Amino acid sequence: ISYDDFERKMRVGNLQDIWKGAQFIHQSVLISRKYQIEHLYNVENKISADFEFFYHSIMSGAKIYKLDKSIAVFKSGGISDTKRLRAMLSNMKVVMSKDFSIFKFFYHGSKMFNELIKIIIKFFLPKKIISFFQKINLR
């Protein structure tokens, strides 16, 4: 992931934890044309159609191969970065619509609460301090 003044490598997480949120960067996924045509993105889901596609694919047992190689570099600042709370809520709706549980509901709720606190703190801190902590936290 390319940030303004540093880069970060991200490894694929545990696919069984997809209910917690994306376990990989969608730009790094290669999908067979046939599978993609048979399983289109939900264009009504404006914020997390990619997450919805991968969530349903993983939960339905689609064949997935993990490569231990970097195959994509992308710049931060997409919708899931700039509209983080909305993206988190949208992901939660995807999970809850198919697999509701109180535990998962509170898990997502606590993640969104933490994100709200971060947004409030970032509002008051100078950009240099925010950037400093991002470098420490994301490396």
What is the predicted function of each stretch?
Residues Y3-S90:
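Conserved nucleotide-sugar donor-binding catalytic segment
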Residues I1, N42, K46, D68-K69, ...:
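Short, structured coil/loop segments at alpha-helix boundaries
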